[in-house]
């Protein structure tokens, strides 16, 4: 099933237009209010840990451009049902941290997994976390010890921040809107060096999602308190050795300067196959951040739709099969390669496990989550590095009042659509194809070269079941 692949570029402006045609002014909300509170915590490592995101790095971080942040927004509906939204300046939250945080929040605050939305900005200038990307870098036992200590501290900071936000809950109103900015480029269909010319000629190729979903939180007096906003584009303008939130970090800093006293929170959309192009300089990262911030600010200054104080939350952890594991002969060949290569480290580790009699996993417990805020606003989250097909397809199926976030709850691998999986099977028609649907699995350490072809169906079917529940009630 490839319904997601039928989306075309022309659909996005229609979706955005239909949003404002259907909802030109705010709806009439109940007199009862939401409750909400946000908390910000600096998570910049105190030590120069290894940085996550680029396999070519040869040393840990050596400074910072600006601080890294974790921000928490807790919302409470009229009936007392709560939702926790977490944004982090990290590459991706791994399963171990997600599971530990969920267990702690359930124990301390009786929050179920469905009520917790944990997003990573996917900055490539943040720290390596526990049990993530360990084959990519030449990590010593001392490095791993420091990474584990940082990860444990991060977990505690997150739990404490949620508790602080719960204590500070105050009456609030929630508002939804959508902006637009166009610096994201489909990296599978455009050669990076050619992008300036292609953009000038209006000839960029491939699906994109240039929408900027915005959730605004105001206090009972109408004062803006928190802005949550998303964008579907890799957070990879920079490749430096200094801590930085990249364009998403600059956007949050800009918004907090534009609106003093407001907490700005970024979430990554379905941007796994999208890049900010051109890139490679801090000036460009600041420029993209400014463009994104202004798209959010413009949205806030225009009429937005007020959301009734109703919240429904669902989640499913669905087993999705991996494709065939590499054979022992294949692993022996890989392990004999360049010892400095992460591919060699991946093959060596798997070969050692195989020789020790260990069994490789054949499927992965994959998170798909659906919230409904008010009577119509859907918010779907998908684990892994999610390609843009999912965002475009789900907005087409479920309606324009649908936000889709990738990089949520567990970033275990790339999350390709069936289209991308098929394009990435050798022989490939493009030199840009192959990574998202194939070789990236080695980066994340999984014992397979790709997901099975069922991945798109499994994710979409899970979303459909949950959308039906939140729309119709259990």
Sequence positions of predicted segments:
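Conserved beta-alpha junction segments in alpha/beta enzyme cores
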Residues: 30-119, 123-263, 267-271, 280-287, ...
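Anionic-ligand-binding alpha/beta catalytic cores of soluble enzymes and soluble regulatory domains
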Residues: 292
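Catalytic histidine-centered segment of alpha/beta-hydrolase-like enzymes
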Residues: 274-275
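N-terminal non-cleavable signal-anchor helices
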Residues: 23-26, 303-306
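Bacterial N-terminal signal peptides that target proteins for export
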Residues: 1-14, 23-25
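Alpha-helical and His/Cys-centered functional microenvironments
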Residues: 10-12, 17, 126-128
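Serine residues within intrinsically disordered or low-complexity segments
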Residues: 18, 27-28
